[in-house]
Amino acid sequence: DLVGINMEGPFISPNKVGAQNPEYVQGADAGMFRRLQKRAGGLIKLVDVAPEEPGNLDFIKECHNEVRISIAHTCTDYDTAVQAFEAGATHMTHLYNAMPGITHRAPGPIIAALEHGAEVELITDNVHIHPAMVRFTFNTFGADHVCLIADSMMACGLPDGQYSLGGQAVTVSGPRATLTEHPGTIAGSATCLYDCMKRAVLEMNVPLESAVRAASENPAKSIGIDNDYGSLAAGRYGNVILADKELNIQAVYQKGTRIV
């Protein structure tokens, strides 16, 4: 089932596009968002915004009651990030990636997110973030505020080779995807979410319970679908993965029916 769409662009910084096509970047536009939301049948659950760009704080103020706002692909400083959270942003997309880091005189958006109780995403493919930073994030933000993501692109589950992302050529080798013309630029990942959760536990020493919650219940809560998804409870869909002690998948159930 398609339960939500993350609108990661185009309301981002032209200086932090990552692997997105810079030709499509623009200022946040409430009218455009609403047209897309109508075409999507209300499935857009998250809109990514660089708050420092002209007019983008106004977009957050206007639209935060219609959709969750996430700070992403940004050059924002601490003070502007604080304004964004106070205006209604609640989320940070792929924390540490495509944003300023933390220094003692320029704490940046990461510390602003911590102080405002934001939900933060981590790509735990062992490519995007060092394992020590993953553990640091769980310990500082708390296991109930971390959402594991794969940030996977079209090559997920496919052989190594050449692929496309937003009209740009991408080279995939193992879990790593990079822009072919700019090999130093990561272009999402080629890893599925379950493998990211597994790596968090087995390679990064994240407690199993914390990793499972961060890959299921927390993301569902962060986009407001936790009445139906994200945990096992009466009235919710019976979507379950059964695994052995080494986290190898043994069975998959979708809405109570075994499919694997």
Give the location of each predicted region.
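Conserved, mostly hydrophobic/aromatic
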Residues: 7, 63, 92, 200, ...
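Electropositive phosphate-/nucleotide-binding environments in soluble metabolic enzymes
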Residues: 26-30, 53-57, 78, 103-107, ...
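Active-site core of metal-dependent hydrolases
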Residues: 34-160
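Divalent-metal coordination cores built from histidine and acidic residues
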Residues: 1-43
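Short, compositionally biased
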Residues: 251-260
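His/Asp/Glu-enriched, well-ordered alpha-helical/loop segment
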Residues: 109-121, 138-150, 155-236, 240-242
